[in-house]
Amino acid sequence: LDYTIDDMTEASVFEGKKAVYFTLGCKLNFAETSTIGRLLKEMGVRTVRAGERADICVVNTCSVTEVADHKCRQAIHKLVRQHPGAFVVVTGCYAQLKPEQVSAIDGVDLVLGAEQKGDILRYLEERLPLLPAERKLADAEHEAYTVPTKDIHTFVPSCSCGDRTRYFLKVQDGCDYYCTYCTIPYARGRSRNGSIASLVRQAEQAALEGGREIVLTGVNIGDFGKTTGESFLDLVKALDRVEGIARYRISSIEPNLLTEEVLAYCAESRAFMPHFHIPLQSGSDEVLKLMRRRYTTKFFAEKISRVKELIPDAFIGVDVIVGTRGETEECFEEAFEFIRSLDVSQLHVFSYSERPGTMALKIEHSVSPEEKHRRSQRLLELSDAKWEAFYRRYIGTEAEVLLEKSRTEGVMHGFTANYIRVELPVEENLDNQIVRVRLGDFNVDRSALRATLL
């Protein structure tokens, strides 16, 4: 099973149809949606333009929090209203975890779980020719195709272009960690991956299409290699050799899997950028234990110090969950002080959300929504201060920036190797080019540093 077009697939069913795509959640979901889009395009389906009605709606869902579930339902209702009569397919984590809930939503024609989404063309080919009335009859039977978590085995490849400069290459899927707050292992199955040879081919193809930067995505990418007997370090070395790709970023890697060898290689690498995203989740050892995370605060602090020792300019983003069960006021204060002490550049702060079926529900102490909000705000303020301090260190320095067109009139944006966002007056011929600049002060909305070309 693969995201590929079977020779038997009947193109006439798809010819001239228009599709709309809606994605919620992580970079991995966005990569998978655009791969589905590419498949349908090859079958003659084009993306709708503003104001047009679609024949096919594809919704790729997220279920990381209760809010995510709610947003998914809202998005489906909205698309059904905007595109009456369209064939509506829902896939992704919410579809895998709650297929009955999703198929019961008015207007949904087909629900595909994690193991089925790679086969979307076959499912559509069988059902698209049906008249809306016949589809409604099928709807009454709730057409949902999923398998139990233990039977999710397929690695569905995906390399997609988020914009013209940056590609997202899916290297791994699933997770074997079963942290107590998280439903992702149930939604995406066991850890599995593509082969290094197949991933190198996809990177080479991205380079041929003009891609300059690739972000490696997955659920637990440091765990790469379980299915193929390879390692994440082997993958990094192989991708570093692909001609035409100037930059790689590692989307997120567990602290215990960011090994000394991987760090040392990235420090000397041709194309792996000094930019890491490392989930911490809590700065309290007591809470880390309740979460079943695989490290202590001491280990985490040493890892951050080691990154900075080997790669002093590295941008380090850190995930933190606030208000989990068991996070008492004392635990939070301890966590806050620990996080303040870390030399990191930005915090990604999430409020804890109760997920049905997770082990965290057995923990007695719970935190009120108001208290969660207060803790979030304190961490967000800390994040802003760390982010600004990191940017300020580079004002007046020279840097290489990969430029991309901006939605803002008259300017272009891009990122330095160490992920500082940069703003320049627009010059069309510089789109998707790497240029040398001098970094100046903050722009008007303080979202980037102004820069001048050298």
Question: Model-predicted segments: where are they?
Answer:
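Terminal RNA-binding accessory module
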Residues: 4, 362-454
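Short glycine-rich, low-complexity segments
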Residues: 345, 358-362
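Hydrophobic, well-ordered secondary-structure elements that form the walls
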Residues: 278, 319, 339, 347, ...
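Short flexible coil/turn linkers enriched for glycine and charged/polar residues
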Residues: 162-165, 175-176, 272, 282, ...
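Short, solvent-exposed loop/turn segments at secondary-structure boundaries
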Residues: 68-70, 190-195, 225-230, 290-293, ...
